[in-house]
Amino acid sequence: MTIHEFGQNHDEVVVLVHPSATMWDYFEYVIPLMQDRYHLIVPALPGYDTETGSDFTSVPEIAEKLANWLIAHGHREIACIYGCSMGGAVVTRFLADRKVKAQSAVIDGGITPYQLPWIVTRLIAVKDFLLISMGKLGGLKILQKAFSTDEYSEEDLQYIVKVLKHMSAKTIWRTFESCNNYAMPKPVVVDCDCIEYWYAKAEEKDRKSDIAYIKKNLPQTLFKVFGHVGHGGLAALKPDLLAEELTRVMGRDKRDETGTNANSDFRN
């Protein structure tokens, strides 16, 4: 897992964890907007790291390695950790491990463990594996049918094609199997009071079980709904909004942190 750093001269540390089917440069439009104010730490996760050629391992292992890296480099407390989709799963487990104190955290469309029978979760993993494998083999034509072309340019889709070609079959399988079924401590106890779960209005139905899981296990979480963007679309399509919202989250005062609960949401 290669770690990329920007704005190292700043004290406030912000960790950005990318989703699946992307690489660390998923944040290429966000980094220039934040590196003049924050020390940004952007890991290239196993299986999506062109510098190591490794396969994806698991959500718990990646969360642990990320925390260990932060501790080894003197970051026992950070201003914020943000993760999208698969990255949101890593953030969820990272918070539960409580190795590093995060003053704030954002789980953007994050995947939580399925609360379903074992055989059902495996069938879902097989379906997801086959869909991504088809995209890997079918290339741009398949992706143009799968994604809304009025949101993503051909250049954006070519980027996804490049990432899919890099992903091994083992990485594809482990990504879905682990993101859908990763273990969490029981009970879930975190030491971060300022947590937000973000999701797009268009994916509200798809995130229903994830939202329910977060409400049950992280009751201090505030929910924010975004319109005019799809799952994981903020970094690529609205980087200014993402940077602005992360800055807002880090600026929430103690009164706001304790006064808003999981039954609340606000819309953008």
Predicted regions and their residues:
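Conserved HGGG/HGGXW glycine-rich cap/lid loop of the alpha/beta-hydrolase fold
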Residues: 4-52
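Active-site loop/oxyanion-hole signature of alpha/beta-hydrolase fold enzymes
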Residues: 41-80
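Gly/Ala-rich beta-loop-alpha elbow adjacent to hydrolase catalytic centers
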Residues: 83-91
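Flexible "cap/lid" loop of the alpha/beta hydrolase fold
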Residues: 96, 102-132
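Conserved alpha/beta-hydrolase catalytic His-Asp/Glu region
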Residues: 116-117, 136-189
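Short beta-strand/loop motif that positions the catalytic acidic residue
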Residues: 191, 196-199
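Acidic catalytic loop of the alpha/beta-hydrolase fold
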Residues: 201-206, 232
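Catalytic histidine-centered segment of alpha/beta-hydrolase-like enzymes
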Residues: 226-241
